[in-house]
Amino acid sequence: MLKRTGQSWRVLLLLGAMAWLPTAVLAEPARWNVDPEHSTIEFRVTHMVVSKTTGRFMDYAGFVDMDAEAGTVKAIEATIKTGSVNTNHEKRDAHLRSADFLDVEHYPTITFKMKSYKKTAEGYTAVGDLTLRGVTKEITLVGQYNGATKDPWGNTRAGFSAEGKLNRKDFGMVWNKTLDSGGLVVGDEVQIRLDIECIKAKS
């Protein structure tokens, strides 16, 4: 009887350990907040066929929920203030804020919410919903997770880079003018470049 009881206890302990094991292995993702002082949200668009114009958004916030050790991401969300657009040209920036383009009076923010994340041999692919001028479209970001490190002030930081593209006409930005050569002043495709640094939230 004692021997059988001892065996039963060993079985119960083994089952308990097996039930606990997945929880121990699959760590809960941590919240990492975007540090705008060390991040860049940049876009490029063809200008008059022969060159590119580059701009940035200066006011934004966001977060990444991830397990940094495993490099797995559960969520990415971001909000960008459209009025913060900056192409280093005041007149052009005013035009971009107008109803011809971003229409900041009626649509003060751009939002992104991740739907799926896949690790690849080259880095990762993140697919999500981008909402701009009241229109929501799916876009794909392809990039790299650059790892995590401690800064001199005790914060843990992680870095991401990514690129994507969209067609501005999909979001109602159809303004253009035709050149004498037959080309257009502004290209339809907008290239996106992100360099994002995040700080791990204190637990």
What do these predicted regions represent?
Residues V11-P22:
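Bacterial N-terminal signal peptides
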Residues V25-S203:
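Low-complexity, acidic/polar, glycine-enriched regions of mature
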Residues L2-L13:
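Bacterial N-terminal signal peptides that target proteins for export
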